[in-house]
Amino acid sequence: MAYYNNPANLQYYDYSYTADNSFNTQSRAAGFYDEPLHEPLSQGWLAAFSTSGYPGEPSLLEELEINFGHIKQKTTHVLNPFKHVDVHIMDDTDMAGPILFCLLFSTFLSLHGRSHFGYIYGIALLGSLSLHFVLRLMSAKNLFFTRTVSVLGYSLLPLVVIAFFKNIFTFNGIAGYALAALACIWCTYAASAMFVGILQVNNMRFLVAYPIALFYGVFAVITVFSK
C-alpha cells in the first residue's frame, strides 16, 4: 500500500508530449476537415437546372441507362435488316429507343386524326406479352421480357416512317396499302432476324416470323385506316 501511495512513482509518467503533440494533432485534424473533399456545387434555384455534380458521379443519362451509341446501332440494324445480326446486340435491353418510337408513332397518327395512344399502348403491351410467351416456348435459352419489348420497339421504326408520311400523302389507294404492307414485312424481317440470333433457332425462322407479322399487321392496319 505504501508503494501505491508514494508520490515519487509519478515520475515514471511522461507528460512532456501532451502540450505540443496534442496541438499538432488537433491542427492536423482541423486542417484535414477544412480541406474540401469535392468542388462546391452551385447554389440557388438555378442549381436544379445545372449539370454540375460530384467528381466521378455518373451522368444522368448513365443513371437512366440511355446510351445514344447503342440506340444508333440498333436503329441502323433495323434500317438494314440484311446485315449480319450480332447475338449480343440486345444484351443491354434499353427501353429509351422503343419508348421514343412508340411515342412518335402515336404522335404522327394523332396529327392526322383522332388520338390512338390508348389503343397503341394496349396492343403493344398485350402483343409483347403474348409474343414473349410464344418465343420462350420455342427455345431453351432464357429470354427476358424487357429484351422482347426492346426488339419489338426498335423494329417498329418502318411503320413509324409510314405514319409520318401519312400526314403528307394519302394512303387510301393501292400504293398506300402496298407501302404499309412493305413496312409490315420490313418490321417482321428485322425483328425475326434479331430473335433468331438471340434465341439461336435458325431452323425456326418462319415460326418466329409468323406471330411477329400478326403483331405488326395490327399496327399497319391502324396506320392505314386511322382517321
Curated annotation (Swiss-Prot):
Required for fusion of ER-derived vesicles with the Golgi during ER-to-Golgi protein transport, probably by mediating correct membrane localization of ypt1. GO terms for cellular component: endoplasmic reticulum membrane; Golgi membrane; trans-Golgi network. It holds the Pfam family Yip1. This is Protein transport protein yip1. Residues 1-92, 136-150, 200-205 are cytoplasmic. It comes from Schizosaccharomyces pombe (strain 972 / ATCC 24843). It is a multi-pass membrane protein. Residues 114, 172-178, 227 are lumenal. It is found in: Endoplasmic reticulum membrane; Golgi apparatus membrane. It comes from the Eukaryota.
